[in-house]
Amino acid sequence: MRRRFLSGIGGATLLLSCFLVTASAQAITYAPVDQPGPALTVPQSALDASLVCTGSVTGAARAPVLLVPGTGGDPAQNYSWSWEPALNKLGIPWCDVTLPDHTQGDVQVAAEYIVNAIRTMYARAGRKISIIGHSQGGMLPRWAFRFWPDTRGMVDDDIGFAASNHGTTGAKFACMPGCSPAAQQQSDTSQFIAALNSYQETFPGISYTEVFTHFDEIVTPNSDDTGSSSVHGGGGEITNVAIQEVCPADISDHLALGTQDNTAYALAIDALSHPGPAIPSNVPMSVCTDPLMPGINKTTYPADVASAAIGFAENEADAPSTTTEPPLKCYVTASCLESRAAVEGKARKCKKQKRHRAAEAGKRRHCKHKKKRH
């Protein structure tokens, strides 16, 4: 684990294409980090319907928390039986967001829901919000920060559980012959992951707490803070920490980490309780004596966890399937934006020329009409 201020900007590369190509064949120049975010393409009615909040979010006395589910999950599976009751007990306002195709569609589309959620919660609360996300849900907010800069000043803590920040090596095998668009995008060699981490991984003003487990069988590798979930550089204040560094005997896997693990819970609550990211040394060893986080009803736990597992399985069975990664959106790459601006400039010039020709034709008709009268 390392808690530190990290800064630095990665080098740029040459753009050759705006659409999906193999990373080895062509390099890409990404949009600058200060490029204003694009307009959202998802209908506002769908964005609004996706966000469910407690009433205390409006004018909140403390930072409300946005709960973002992982791939194959909805808030019902990820949070309804664990994190939502836990936050209620602590008096922390929260919202959860339901993403298209059970968080298995194009992650770039899902990111628009996150952008809307951040903006909506910030406006309602009148203050910065915090985010807790599992797996893809831990990575998604970073796409929002990267390509919608206005969201950066709206977020205090960004907390990821087993976040797929650098993709996973397992996607190569899971996606043979095909898999969901989101799974394709979360391959460690995908264009999406390269774009996500382009130029800088974090941004000043946001505290990043990235919690991972050495027993993660989905997001790999995650043996130390050079693994997939950890983030580095860019100016954000960062804690990358394995639950085993706090509780060495904790054997939670990928799913347990983001839904029920007590060590992960303690680290997240510590992060929410003071400025900056989690400080692992603040977590008492007594946390290690109970594997289940507060908020879980131990009487109904067997039924709750079974229901969640069935829900994940049913969602994954309904997942759309593709053999290729969705192409990067135009706003991601610099030359695509430049090409679009050039095309739009030409279109404006053509319209102006047409208006000029129409005006000239009108003048000629007027002169002809005057000659006939005389």
Where are these regions (language model features)?
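C-terminal catalytic-base region of ester-bond hydrolases, centering on the histidine
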Residues: 204-342
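Active-site catalytic motif of lipid deacylating hydrolases and related acyltransferases
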Residues: 28-44, 52-128, 299-326, 333-341
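Polybasic, low-complexity, intrinsically disordered segments
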Residues: 340-374
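Secretory targeting and sorting signals
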Residues: 1-26
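Sequence contexts marking disulfide-bonded cysteines in secreted/extracellular proteins
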Residues: 52-54, 174-180, 246-248, 287-289, ...
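Secretory pathway export signals and precursors
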Residues: 14, 49, 91, 171, ...
